[in-house]
Curated annotation (Swiss-Prot):
Function: One of several proteins that assist in the late maturation steps of the functional core of the 30S ribosomal subunit. Associates with free 30S ribosomal subunits (but not with 30S subunits that are part of 70S ribosomes or polysomes). Required for efficient processing of 16S rRNA. May interact with the 5'-terminal helix region of 16S rRNA.
Protein name (database record): Ribosome-binding factor A
GO cellular component terms given for this protein: cytosol
Annotated family: Belongs to the RbfA family.
Subcellular location: Cytoplasm
UniProt keyword annotation of Electron transport present: no
Gene designation: rbfA
Amino acid sequence: MPKDFSRTLRVADQVQRELASLIQNEIMDPRIGMITLTGVEVTRDYTYAKVFYTTLGGNENAQLAEEGLKRAAGFLRSQLAGKIRLRIIPKLQFVYDESIERGIKLSRLIDEAVGKT
């Protein structure tokens, strides 16, 4: 497993904050709707960034949101170039984050198991 570098983590955090602001204020695509950015992973050379997101409607809205985000990726990247001072602005890859849904399912299973005993 590669070692995490503090600068890479700081850049990922800044990319997440700027993208959240841009998506909320600049993107008017109705497919995107209410999404939450849960994390960003940037490669060490800053060429790629995986942006993890969740949607308010769960899996039903995830596919539509992914299409909208992929369509807006070029615009978001160009806007990031004006807000972040990096020599290379990372290419954005949007990935639906299922960890919250899995956590809710596990919590329900635990509650059911505790309730049966």
